[in-house]
């Protein structure tokens, strides 16, 4: 039994043997053929994938580029206008907020929550960005385990290729670009250094003048 639900112009129009899909909106999941257990709500949500499984795309163009060549349990979740809109073969990403992770392509295991969070990266893996503009400049052009964590408005917002950083607090580590292995906890902590490494700053404006 199929248990598919489709509402909207050409929603799920290509499904052949896929099951348990919920597709709501014009062209939502319109390329799915054998993909199963997907939820796509919004125009063109999950609109290119034909064999992917277990995805949630809620919002205009969410996961619209995802497309696996073989049946794959990808476990991607994207919610918000354009969230994850460039993901092609990345797996296990959670992208919530308008344009969150919207440049990611084949990156894996990322969490981006907030407008534009992790919005420039294409191939970085295993980063957590929570807050408007958090890690929104990070961009690895080859598959890289970045292990950056940024929580707070603009936290780590200038990081490009730095790795192993933890920024907790609004604007913490805000101008870091390539610095690595730093910890900044507190609003404005370590917010002027650009390339330093192995520093720990805890408290409001801690190490704010280090550069």
Each PLM stretch: what is its role?
Residues 1-211:
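Glycine- and small/polar-enriched repetitive beta-structure motifs of secreted/surface proteins
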